[in-house]
Regions:
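Glycine/proline-enriched, intrinsically flexible loops and inter-domain linkers
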Residues: 1-81, 86, 90-111, 115-440
């Protein structure tokens, strides 16, 4: 329910600032306490805040519903202070988690005896078992090859750790010490996030805080909706793009997306995309993912507004086809889904480029995923997991940005690579004009 309580602009800014500060603190906690390189060096982690309805208040969930799959097993009325839930199952979460290495922790926030919000911590984990070290392989053909599936479980019950379930999950990793260190870092971040939200509710009061958070979502939705109607003209635009084969056969895959506007109704249709892949490049798109891609573009017009559930207001309907590469059937493998959703983001920009006459950043290359797996002399696995950012497409006013991801991740520092792994880096540099010299 949306609050009707009026909040003055200064208080709203203070509440907004409290959310920003809390997220920064909790993410720094993960970075400084996690053990695996993919989290502490590559920074593939995040903390998000959700309202009592499960809608994003502030963060980067890409339009995903992070709470419903927990509610399916643990209804909100059964939750208690001190509970913490854990899952990574892409299919049970309906694509809110996109592949098994992405572990999610969810904590309800209780204030004055009721749930007023949820805290969500997430990170990409080093290894969860499966067919290969790192739990990712392009030639994997089913989700069981991608590592241990954790359905939504209550890992902490009113402050008490479910040690039996925890030990089972740790036992299924080739690197249980790293997995334990990383999971405890995320648990700590979720706990700290709860503390900060409770302080915020105590400082401003429940009604004022809820009203402020509701107003922020409404403001973002209003801005995004107005911009989408201003920028997207009447008619239809479509894009088809292709991906390399999945490593199982020589078959190439494509997806097709069509953006349509009829009066004030905007729809996105991807039902003409190819059938699901035989390997692991399938992307199980959540209901809100494609809407969020558009919302992120429109958010640039007023970055003073929080990126939240309001970003989904850009699109009225999204149509996907069950059994396609964007909505694969169980138990299709999903480990290398980043190749698909990164290109899908570029296709969203291509649709907007058609709609705006080219006033959009050009398509970007998919980042390089490198896995070095080897047995050490003692018989233990040595694993180096690296995603190498290749940069962004050209912008209407400047060349593209070099060597960065489409999201929040970073490349490994050269010094770290040489200290952590048995290698010597002879050169670490940007290939001059490898994507073209550009206009600027």
């Amino acid at each position: 329910m949306t609050s009707t309580h009026n909040v003055d602009p200064v208080t709203r800014q203070l509440v907004r600032g409290s959310l920003r500060a809390a997220r920064l603190e909790c993410e720094l906690l993960i970075e400084r306490t996690a053990m695996s390189a993919f989290i502490r060096e590559k920074k593939d982690y995040q903390v998000n805040f959700l309202d009592r309805n499960g809608h994003e208040l502030y963060g980067d969930t890409m339009g995903s519903d992070m709470v419903q799959c927990v509610w399916d097993t643990y209804p909100a009325e059964t939750m208690a202070p001190g509970d913490l839930y854990w899952y990574n199952d892409p299919y049970l979460s309906k694509g809110s988690v996109t592949h098994t290495p992405d572990m999610t922790f969810l904590a309800p926030v209780f204030f004055e005896g009721e749930v007023v919000a949820y805290c969500h911590s997430f990170a990409h984990f080093w290894d969860l078992g499966g067919s290969r070290p790192g739990s990712i392989g392009p030639a994997n053909t089913e989700i069981f090859h991608d590592g241990t599936l954790v359905p939504p479980i209550k890992i902490v019950d009113q402050g008490k750790l479910n040690d039996e379930a925890y030990r089972i999950i740790l036992r299924n990793s080739r690197y249980p010490d790293l997995l334990e260190g990383d999971t405890r870092a995320l648990m700590a971040a979720a706990n700290r996030a709860q503390e900060r939200l409770l302080e915020m509710f105590a400082r401003f009061g429940k009604e004022t805080t809820l009203a402020s958070l509701d107003a922020d979502q409404a403001d973002t939705a209003k801005m995004v909706r107005e911009k989408s109607l201003e920028i997207i003209p009447q008619g239809s635009f479509s894009v088809r793009d292709y991906m390399d084969h999945a490593g199982v056969s020589d078959r190439w895959y494509s997806y097709h997306v069509k953006l349509s506007r009829d009066e004030d109704r905007i729809t996105l249709d991807a039902t003409e995309s190819d059938d699901q892949a035989d390997g692991s490049i399938n992307f199980l798109a959540s209901d809100g993912a494609l809407s969020a891609y558009f919302g992120q573009y429109f958010h640039q017009y007023d970055t003073s507004l929080l990126p939240n559930h309001g970003l989904l207001a850009a699109i009225d309907e999204v149509h996907l086809r069950q059994g396609s590469i964007l909505q694969p059937d169980w138990p299709a493998a999903l480990g290398c889904r980043a190749h698909t959703f990164t290109k899908l983001k570029s296709s969203v920009r291509a649709l907007l480029a058609e709609a705006t006459g080219g006033k959009v950043m050009a398509g970007s290359a998919v980042y390089v995923i490198a896995y070095w797996r080897m047995k050490e002399s003692g018989g233990d696995w040595l694993l180096c997991t690296d995603g190498i950012a290749v940069g962004h497409g050209a912008r209407p006013f400047a060349d593209g940005l070099d060597a960065i991801y489409s999201r929040h991740n970073e490349n490994y520092p050269g010094e770290f690579m040489e200290m952590e792994y048995p290698l010597r880096m002879e050169r670490y540099a940007i290939a001059q004009d490898s994507g073209g010299p550009g206009k600027y």
